[in-house]
Design a protein with these regions (language model features):
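Metal-dependent nuclease catalytic regions and adjoining charged, substrate-binding loops involved
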Residues: 113-116, 128-209, 215
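Long, highly charged amphipathic alpha-helices
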Residues: 35, 39, 124, 175-182, ...
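Well-ordered mid-protein domain cores that form the structural environment of catalytic cofactors
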Residues: 57-153
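Conserved structured core elements
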Residues: 34, 116-119, 123, 225-228
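Metal-dependent nuclease catalytic cores that hydrolyze phosphodiester bonds in DNA/RNA
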Residues: 1-101, 220, 226-266
């Protein structure tokens, strides 16, 4: 998914992971995601099912998944690990249909609705699933029902609601090989020259922003706040410090005020 946000990002994830800095909001989102994932195991498993462990290494996780699927497992498989053409996925919930002759894939998100990036994520999972030699009957996204009310006694039934994305995913599948090829080229070749912009925070805040955005100055452009697209254009025009930006390139009352105050060196 990283490559769909920014090819430079996926290159850095492989070659310069040391440059990553996760914001407190991102760390909190990770924690919530893990909690929702644990709840999905509880809700879909109902005390049953097998979670594929990753602490014994990738090879073992892949082997365990294949063994479980080959056995026609009737119980849910959690974190099923599959690989195809160098692309690795871990399926949150994998449910057997017709004693393992077909499968139902469920991706779980700590969101309250289906977002465009979720469809792309599911498309990649479906492509790997099929490429690894397995068919699927359907692929769905389970997200939090924002109308859910907890009534006590540890009963969270109804917390997650499923949306069938099979049709939307099928439309994206022909494009997945192109995405994969682009990602491989970005990883194996020199770092892509991608300018900063709105994609730095959408759909997720990039942990490499501190590296890509100019910050070796007293008043970096990011200090203007607001639209990353507008700030990215200023950086593309060669500006690193707020004080160096000509007034003609500043728009919007908020940016104009910050620009004036910063250049004047005193508050208004």
């Amino acid at each position: 998914m990283s490559s769909l946000q920014c090819l430079k990002k996926v290159h850095l994830e492989i070659h310069r992971k040391d440059l990553q800095v996760f914001s407190s909001d991102t760390e909190r989102a990770f924690a919530i995601g893990h909690e929702v994932g644990d709840m999905a195991i509880r809700l879909y498993g109902q005390g049953r099912g097998v979670e594929v462990q990753y602490d014994s290494g990738l090879a073992r996780a892949l082997m365990t998944t294949e063994e479980l699927m080959a056995s026609g497992a009737q119980e849910p498989i959690f974190e099923a690990t599959l690989e195809h053409e160098g692309v690795l996925v871990r399926e949150d919930v994998l449910l057997s249909v017709d004693s393992g002759s077909d499968w139902r894939i469920v991706e779980v998100k700590a969101s309250t609705k289906v977002k465009p990036e979720h469809v792309l994520d599911c498309a990649i999972q479906a492509w790997v699933h099929r490429g690894a030699g397995h068919d699927f009957e359907s692929i769905s996204l389970a997200h939090i029902d924002n109308q859910f009310r907890y009534r006590g006694d540890g009963n969270y039934d109804g917390l997650l609601v499923e949306n069938d994305l099979t049709e939307a995913v099928q439309k994206e599948l022909p494009t997945v090989p192109h995405w994969v090829e682009e990602a491989k080229e970005a990883v194996e070749g020199p770092m892509p020259d991608i300018p900063v912009g709105a994609h730095c925070t959408k759909p997720y805040k990039c942990p490499f922003m501190g590296y890509c955005w100019p910050n070796d100055t007293d008043y970096p452009i990011s200090g203007l706040g607001g639209s990353r697209k507008k700030l990215g254009l200023l950086v593309m025009n060669g500006h690193e410090d707020i004080r160096d930006v000509p007034p003609s390139e500043i728009s919007g009352a908020g940016h104009e005020r910050i620009h004036r105050v910063t250049r004047a060196g005193e508050s208004e």
